[in-house]
């Protein structure tokens, strides 16, 4: 009986860890990609409010707002589109 309980707890722990890996990787990738694509501007804020410019991560947006290529407005922030 003890072995069954331990095995169940291990299964739950590994399942939880495997489900958490993808969001953690996505968040880390968003941070890296935002800095790599920003053209030397670490914050990505330069010219974001100018006409015709795109918005970067950590900048608020509305769904019709133009985020940069490969990015989408989701939950009020520009996010990288994964799986392209």
Curated annotation (Swiss-Prot):
Weakly nhibits voltage-gated sodium channels Nav1.7/SCN9A. High concentration of the toxin (3 uM) inhibits Nav1.7/SCN9A currents by 79%. Disulfide bonds join 54-68, 61-73, 67-78. GO terms for molecular function: sodium channel regulator activity; toxin activity. The modification Leucine amide is found at residue 82. It comes from Heteropoda pingtungensis (Pingtung huntsman spider). This is Mu-Sparatoxin-Hp1. Its main location: secreted. Residues 1-20 form the signal peptide. The presence of a 'disulfide through disulfide knot' structurally defines this protein as a knottin. The keyword Endoplasmic reticulum does not apply. Belongs to the neurotoxin 10 (Hwtx-1) family. Keywords: Amidation, Disulfide bond, Ion channel impairing toxin, Knottin, Neurotoxin, Secreted, Signal, Toxin, Voltage-gated sodium channel impairing toxin.
